[in-house]
Regions:
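Amphipathic, interaction-prone secondary-structure segments
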Residues: 34-71
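Intrinsically disordered, low-complexity regulatory segments in eukaryotic proteins
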Residues: 26-33
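N-terminal trafficking/processing presequences and adjacent post-cleavage segments
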Residues: 1-22
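A short, surface-exposed interaction/processing loop segment used at functional sites
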Residues: 69-87
Length: 87
């Protein structure tokens, strides 16, 4: 799977995941322009990407494509805190 195809699949999956779980009282549905790629990498036959959205829920979506086994994985994380630690 090429990088472009992989990132398109990731974006579609974030939209599908969010829209199937969002509270209906929020009156929000995600569209393609609400999803962005934070980071991505392709090594040999494998792809990995970290995506997020314009929604202020702190969720990150990590995707991995294992090119050897032709398997796709999605992990969803919640950013709990970001703080500076002085050394």
């Amino acid at each position: 799977m090429g990088t472009k195809e992989f990132l398109e699949w990731c974006t579609e999956e974030v939209i599908r995941y969010f829209n199937s779980r969002v509270d209906k009282t929020d009156n929000k549905t995600l569209k393609e322009e609400d999803v962005f790629v934070v980071w991505n990498c392709k090594t040999l036959k494998n792809n990995k990407a970290l995506l997020s959205t314009t929604v202020s829920d702190g969720l990150y979506y990590e995707f991995t494509f294992n090119g050897n086994s032709e398997e796709l994985y999605m992990e969803v994380y919640k950013k709990w805190e970001n703080r500076c630690i002085n050394l």
